Every structure is written in C-alpha cells, then in structure tokens.
Amino acid sequence: MDSRAGNTADPRGGRRGGGLQGSRSPRARQLLERLDARPLAARAAADLTALVRKAGATLRLRHTEGVSGLDSADIEVTDSRLPHATLVKHRPQHQRSETLGTWTEPLPVTQNKASYALKVPQATGRFSVELTRGPAGFGLTLSGGRNVSGDAPLTVHGLLKDGPAQRCGRLQAGDLVLYINGQSTQGLTHAQVVERIRTGGPHLCLVLQRPQDMDGSRIKEVGGHRKTDRSLDPRGSRVESRSTISPVHHRPKTRTSPRPSPEAVAIGHVVRAVEHPTEDLENRIPGTPGPWLVPSEDRLSRALGVRGGGAQLALEMAAGRRRH
C-alpha cells in the first residue's frame, strides 16, 4: 500500500489513512463514488477493505469537488504485474435523492426538445407540466387576464406546431392556467403573465386544470335550475321560449274587454265579445267558441229578469232582431 494513502498502521497489514494527500481540509461531500469501477454506495466497510486489498500494489485516489449526492472521482489503480497503470474514470449516470434515499433517472434536457415532469393529484384534478424553452420559445399562446373581458380566467389559447408544448402531449387548448413557476395567476393582467414567463428563465412550470373537471358540479347545478324553470311552467316549456309565441296568445292576458250590457247579451253580442280570449289557444278556428261560453236560456232569463222561461226569452230575442 502506498504511503500516500495514509500513515496509520492497520493490524491486518494495511494502513488506515488520516486524509488524502493534497487535501488540507477534506469536506464531507468529497465522497468516492466508485472503487475499481465498482459502486461504493451500497457496500459495507468490510467489503471496502477487501476491495482495497485486491486493488494491487499501489492505490492512488484523486477526489473531485462534490456537485451532487454522489461525487464523481477519478481512480487510478497501479499494479506491478500490469504493464501500464489503469485509469478508471466515471461520471455519475444516476442522481440520488438525499432526502428520500431513492435512485431516479435524470431527465434528458436538450435545447430543441422540452423536458417535462407530470404530477396528477387525483384529489383536485390538477396537473403540472414543465417545459424547456426552445428556439421559438415554449410553443404556446395564452389568453385572458384581469384586464381582458372583465377578469377572464387565464387559459391556453393555442399550441404552436412542433413546439415544446405540443411535443409535450399533455397540454390542450382551453386548459386553465392556475400557477406559473409556483405563483398563482389570480388577479394578474395579461402583461404581467407575459413578463413572468419571460423572466422565469429557460424552464416553465405550469399548474393547469381541465375546464370540464372544474365545472362539472357547476354544470349539474345549472341543469337543476333549468329543470326547476320548466316545472314552473304548466305547459312544460321554457320561460325563454315564450318570446317565440305568437302575439295572439298574449292578447287575452293584456287586453280586457268591457262587461257587456244586458241588451248586448240579449241580441247575442256576448258571444262575439268573449270569443277573442279563446282564439288559437288550442288551434281552434276563430269565431267558434267552446260550449262553456254559450249561456243557457234559463240563466239568461234569470239575468235579464224575463218571466216565462225560455219561451218568453225567445220572443224577446226575436223582437230585438226585428228592431235592429
């Protein structure tokens, strides 16, 4: 074992290093990722000792500054039995989450293709999309804002062809934009939204919601109100449909005819005076009143005070026709 690896003797034949040469203040994040092209993250101390013993006659370690959960390192293993020294270089292919302790594949990020992360909270129906700016921007247009159409909601107006938003495959025209880069869009003007996207950097994180998911309950309520409106009308038609009804139907409600005098009843004018409210109510021909509008002779005789019943009333009516 080379003395450069440490200066403390190990009773089992090795030397326990007290620090790396050339590193005056080693940091905790200066970790070795691989030894002899083998990962160290899931190995125990006894396994590390065995690997060091199998490394050869000389072991040289060169650390690099930590930039992630597992730092990259260049490891050189020299053995007198080998003609030349072997240099093993490794760059981290995975990214480790320090808080969760899980391994996740890194997202490929290019300039021409958007990389996005989709999260769908089932409770709220919202989802988030992360886009990367391309040569022509993010590839979407927005509409709405506080000064547009009286505080209209901010929505996705359209997607540019072959843009990052269209290649994402998650966005649709009409989606409601609730958050931009973690900040709510409520109360923002259209100019403020554009400025926030422009100054947000090469990445854009949007939290959206489908209109049908948000307005499902509202549509049910509106349908319930419409049903109530139809039940109020005894004919089963909508209140708005009354504007299309012929004006003849409104005449019996708006026009009131004076009560006929007894003389008019005697000469038969009462039929023509009461005929008008019944016109076109059930597609009847005007001038043909229903049977309930023709008074009986007994009622007419009692109303006019004519004695003798129907015979005397017929004589009076005949005399009236002759006079007129």
UniProtKB/Swiss-Prot annotation:
<feature type="region of interest" description="Disordered">
    <location>
        <begin position="1"/>
        <end position="26"/>
    </location>
</feature>
<dbReference type="InterPro" id="IPR001478">
    <property type="entry name" value="PDZ"/>
</dbReference>
<dbReference type="Pfam" id="PF00595">
    <property type="entry name" value="PDZ"/>
</dbReference>
<feature type="domain" description="PDZ">
    <location>
        <begin position="128"/>
        <end position="212"/>
    </location>
</feature>
<feature type="compositionally biased region" description="Basic and acidic residues">
    <location>
        <begin position="216"/>
        <end position="241"/>
    </location>
</feature>
<feature type="region of interest" description="Disordered">
    <location>
        <begin position="216"/>
        <end position="263"/>
    </location>
</feature>
<dbReference type="InterPro" id="IPR030031">
    <property type="entry name" value="MAGIX"/>
</dbReference>
<dbReference type="InterPro" id="IPR036034">
    <property type="entry name" value="PDZ_sf"/>
</dbReference>
<feature type="modified residue" description="Phosphoserine">
    <location>
        <position position="261"/>
    </location>
</feature>
<protein>
    <recommendedName>
        <fullName>PDZ domain-containing protein MAGIX</fullName>
    </recommendedName>
</protein>
<keyword id="KW-0597">Phosphoprotein</keyword>
